Swiss-Prot record:
Its main location: cytoplasm. This is Holliday junction branch migration complex subunit RuvA. It comes from Photobacterium profundum (strain SS9). The RuvA-RuvB-RuvC complex processes Holliday junction (HJ) DNA during genetic recombination and DNA repair, while the RuvA-RuvB complex plays an important role in the rescue of blocked DNA replication forks via replication fork reversal (RFR). RuvA specifically binds to HJ cruciform DNA, conferring on it an open structure. The RuvB hexamer acts as an ATP-dependent pump, pulling dsDNA into and through the RuvAB complex. HJ branch migration allows RuvC to scan DNA until it finds its consensus sequence, where it cleaves and resolves the cruciform DNA. Belongs to the RuvA family. Residues 65-143 are annotated as: Domain II. Residues 158-206 are annotated as: Domain III. One of its GO terms (cellular component) is cytoplasm. Residues 1-64 are annotated as: Domain I.
């Protein structure tokens, strides 16, 4: 099992990050709520990981905190919820927002997540509300949506490329191509990085 990676960020292509650990590059998929908080390319990072082995692939899912990883593990235990949907859930909302949605039985919010229909949302609430009892708030989770975007987050590439990357990331998270392109065009502003475009796009759809 690979439970933790400590190294240097080589590439950031939402929702995937490439991190160099001792000369080996690991591709790690991260929910956008965690991706937003990553350091810049070339800087050191520590990522808590969940390792999945399939017949056709070996996949790493990454998180900034152990608590976020543990929530992901609880989510994918739910009937009909796999890693891809778990990634989409924690990309559409922060860990704390998901916990509150389950506790409040907020089906309306949950069904806005790509891949989550009414039955899946109801199943998540039924299966997870007891398991999530005792999960704290405040310091346990730090909502990425509350963090102001800094100048360091503005990437040095054109707006067109940033928009294309944002659309590709949304499609990878389960949104339809037309829906992704439409929402990106609605939220994009001059000089926005792809990460900030994705953040605003996801926020507008939940």
């Amino acid at each position: 099992m690979i439970g933790r990676l400590s190294g240097t960020i080589l590439e950031k292509q939402p929702p995937e990050v490439l991190i160099d650990v001792g000369g080996i590059g690991y591709e790690v998929q991260m929910p956008m709520s965690c991706f937003y908080e990553l350091p810049e390319v070339g800087q050191a990072a520590v990522i808590c990981t969940h390792f999945i082995v399939r017949e056709d692939a070996q996949l790493l899912y990454g998180f900034n905190k152990k608590s976020e990883r543990e929530l992901f593990r609880e989510v994918i235990k739910a009937n009909g919820v796999g890693p891809k949907l778990g990634l989409a859930i924690l990309s559409a909302m922060t860990a704390s927002q998901f916990v509150l949605s389950v506790e409040n039985e907020d089906i309306t919010t949950l069904v806005k997540i790509p891949g989550v229909g009414k039955k899946t949302a109801e199943r998540l609430v039924i299966e997870m509300r007891d398991r999530l009892k005792g999960w704290g708030e405040g310091d346990l989770f730090t909502p990425a949506s509350d963090a102001a975007a800094s100048n360091a987050e503005i990437q040095k590439y054109s707006s067109a490329r940033a928009e294309d990357e944002a659309v590709s990331a949304l499609i990878a998270l389960g949104y339809k191509a037309l829906q992704a392109a439409k929402v990106v065009s609605q939220v994009v502003k001059p000089e926005m990085s792809s990460e900030n475009i994705i953040r605003e796009a996801l926020r507008s759809m939940v």
